[in-house]
């Protein structure tokens, strides 16, 4: 049985003690007995009631630093479990016979460098402030399991998907059409997709209702209600003292965190960001600055075109929930967005290039791990492709796009994106003959019913023509294959194909005469020289 599986068993046992009001107090490797198929906690002599002062037992290096002031608490056991996991998996320095506090530098610790989520997990479990640790053994167990699943998927290449117990699935995708902007904006640049922070905000998952919240039962059943209906229900409940929701009258206007979050979320769905933000600030005062509040703060920041602030919020959520898909997707999306905005600036400040590289590295890391963990997260596949193209790694861009399942509604979009990744976005002289041929081969596999196909044919043929101008010796038709998209792979053949494709597209353009005339003019310009 591996170490992390053993810790899951320990968390289960300690969680049971907590459920009956007891604290184990002395979790450490010496008190864990691992058999072939089970794990046992031994030496129960230090077990005491929660808040039970008196003799405080524990082992330096594993014992929570605040226990003398607070007495035995759930948070103190969480700390000891985190320290135990750290000592068993990474090198912790010893001084005067005890392990020193803290964790080693993640940059110089291979386990952390290879598994950043694991570092975040230990960081939260062993936080100096008990309020920043996992709230329960069950919560920590869920995150340990999620991090373990991600680690196995990344190291084996075999996806390990699972539904989250604290987040909904992703509500929609974002960024799937971005690389097809040259196709969609062929006639009108305004028709091309762009990286919109609001699209990211609306696509991200949202936190599930905490089942321990007093209003959980009613709010869970109403989670998908129309936002106006949600607001009407909450206002009516508030007017009657929340009797219908809580089963008793309360005078407090904020008796439940989840009621307040449902109200803020409803305003966000109605695009009323200012009201939602004001509510979230009020919620922080009444219920504390939990990761759920930070999540919605991040959504507000995205909708207000403040990606830097959103990035900070989502990064805090990731630190609290290191095994969750939602925060990783949010951090990746906002990091890429900031990097794109910085790249588009004409006046680059000193250090901006390094900042862009750092942001893209963060985005690439999370997209990569998300995609390897779950092939249903197609947003991550397209994100990986974009960042690979930005880095000049065109083979790396194709790989995740080819892995998009045929059952996905984005399957044809992924195939089209792979074609564009091979031939567009750089000088034709930098494109290879092999890439042009591969793009054409892939394009022929896309059904003719795909609306973008005719424009993509023009892009591939146009790139081939530009490549021939940059490589004059290639214009004589040497090399295999001898044809491209049904036309001879010579300058004359490619010009003929380009002309024919332009005229076909002109015939299909019936609603905009300017576009039609432009296509005819282009066809006349590129057609091969003839005697008539």
Language-model features: locations:
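Conserved activation segment of eukaryotic-like protein kinases, specifically the C-terminal portion
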Residues: 53-66
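Activation segment signature within eukaryotic-like protein kinase domains
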Residues: 6-7
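Regulatory extensions appended to serine/threonine kinase catalytic cores
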Residues: 154-263
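Conserved catalytic-loop aspartate of Hanks-type protein kinases
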Residues: 77
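Conserved C-terminal C-lobe helix
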Residues: 113-128
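Catalytic-loop of the protein kinase fold
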Residues: 18-34
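Terminal C-lobe "cap" of eukaryotic-type protein kinase domains
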Residues: 131-132, 139-154
């Amino acid at each position: 049985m591996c170490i992390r599986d053993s810790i899951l068993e320990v968390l289960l046992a300690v969680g049971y003690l907590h459920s009956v009001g007891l604290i184990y107090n002395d979790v450490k490797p010496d008190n864990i007995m691992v058999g072939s198929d089970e794990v046992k906690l031994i030496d129960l002599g230090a077990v005491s009631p929660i808040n039970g002062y008196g003799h405080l037992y524990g082992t330096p290096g594993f014992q929570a630093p605040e226990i003398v002031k607070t007495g035995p608490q759930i948070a103190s056991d969480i700390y000891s479990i985190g320290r135990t996991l750290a000592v068993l998996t990474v090198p912790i320095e010893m001084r005067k016979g005890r392990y020193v506090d803290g964790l080693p530098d993640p940059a110089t610790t291979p386990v952390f460098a290879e598994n950043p989520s694991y570092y975040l997990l230990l960081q939260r479990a062993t936080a100096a402030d008990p309020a920043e640790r996992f709230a329960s053994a069950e919560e920590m167990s869920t995150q340990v399991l999620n991090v373990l699943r991600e680690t196995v998927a990344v190291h084996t290449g075999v996806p390990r998907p699972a539904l989250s117990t604290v987040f909904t699935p992703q509500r929609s995708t974002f960024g799937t059409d971005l690389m097809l902007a040259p196709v969609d904006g062929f006639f009108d640049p305004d028709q091309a997709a762009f990286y919109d922070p609001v699209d990211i905000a609306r696509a991200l998952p949202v936190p599930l209702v905490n089942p321990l919240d007093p209003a959980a039962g009613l709010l869970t059943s109403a989670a998908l209600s129309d936002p106006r209906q949600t607001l009407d229900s909450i206002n009516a409940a508030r007017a009657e003292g929340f009797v219908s929701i809580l089963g008793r009258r309360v005078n407090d206007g904020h008796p439940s965190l989840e009621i307040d979050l449902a109200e803020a979320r409803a305003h966000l769905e109605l695009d009323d960001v200012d009201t939602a933000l004001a509510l979230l600030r009020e919620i922080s005062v009444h219920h504390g600055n939990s990761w759920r509040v930070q999540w919605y703060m991040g959504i507000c920041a995205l909708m207000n075109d403040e990606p830097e602030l959103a990035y900070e919020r989502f990064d805090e959520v990731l630190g609290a929930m290191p095994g969750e898909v939602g925060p990783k997707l949010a951090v990746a999306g906002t990091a890429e967005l900031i990097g794109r905005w910085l790249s588009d600036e004409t006046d680059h400040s000193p250090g901006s290039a390094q900042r862009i590289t750092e942001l893209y590295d963060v985005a690439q890391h999370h997209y990569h791990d998300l995609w390897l963990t779950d092939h249903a997260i197609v947003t991550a596949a397209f994100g990986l492709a974009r960042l690979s193209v930005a880095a000049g790694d065109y083979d790396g861009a194709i790989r995740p796009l080819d892995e998009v399942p045929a059952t996905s509604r984005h399957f044809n979009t992924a195939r089209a994106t792979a074609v564009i990744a091979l031939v567009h976005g750089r000088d034709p002289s930098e494109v290879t003959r092999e890439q042009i041929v591969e793009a054409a081969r892939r394009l022929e596999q896309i059904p003719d019913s795909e609306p973008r196909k005719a424009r993509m044919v023009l892009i591939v043929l146009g790139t081939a023509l530009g490549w021939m101008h940059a490589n004059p010796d290639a214009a004589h038709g040497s090399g295999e294959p001898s044809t491209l998209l049904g036309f001879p792979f010579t300058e004359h053949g490619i010009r003929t194909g380009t002309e024919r494709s332009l005229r076909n597209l002109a015939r299909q353009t019936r609603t905009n005469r300017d576009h039609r005339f432009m296509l005819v003019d282009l066809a006349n310009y590129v057609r091969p020289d003839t005697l008539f």
